[in-house]
Design a protein with these regions (language model features):
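N-terminal catalytic or cofactor-binding beta/alpha core of small enzyme domains
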Residues: 1-120, 126-138, 142-154
Length: 155
């Protein structure tokens, strides 16, 4: 299944860069995995996923969970989604639902969001907090394993 991993985030806003850090580590560790990083969100995400059968979007979230907690959402399997703070204007799930209405033929059939609960997205800095760093490593390992096995497990 033709898959792309999209990391969303801002590298100078600490934990908000988690998705981009995942992509950077994938490029270094597993260059066979197609991946890209986006900073602006919405339209940039929709454009990056065109032509793929599966998209895995990794983003920092603020849902009230413990920092570093990893959550997985199969977008097609849910009509309701938890309220998740996004610093990118429109949250990722809403972006994908909008894409389905506008570009239904070009959207990947499988859409997975991996959210990493952020601790600090307001302070400026290029390093993530320690719990988010650990979560980034777990997500990278999971995506690499998925690329070998062809599936993705629940965290």
């Amino acid at each position: 299944m033709k898959t792309i991993v999209i990391g969303v985030g801002n590298l100078v806003r600490r934990d908000d860069g988690a998705g981009v850090h995942v992509v950077n580590r994938l490029k270094a560790r597993a260059p066979w995995i197609e991946s890209t990083a986006v900073a602006l969100g919405s339209l940039e995400i929709l454009e990056a996923m065109k032509g793929y059968e599966r998209v895995i979007i990794v983003d920092a979230v603020k849902s009230g969970a413990q920092p570093g907690e990893i959550m997985k959402v199969d977008v097609k399997a849910t009509n309701n989604h938890p309220s998740i703070y996004s610093s990118h204007g429109i949250d990722v799930i809403t972006t994908l639902k909008l894409g389905e209405k506008i570009f239904s033929e070009e959207m990947p059939k499988e859409q997975i969001i991996i959210g990493i609960e952020a601790d600090d997205v307001l302070e400026y800095g290029t390093n993530c907090t320690s719990r988010v760093e650990r979560a980034i490593d777990i997500v990278v390992n999971e995506i690499v394993s998925m690329s070998v096995s062809g599936g993705i497990s629940y965290f």
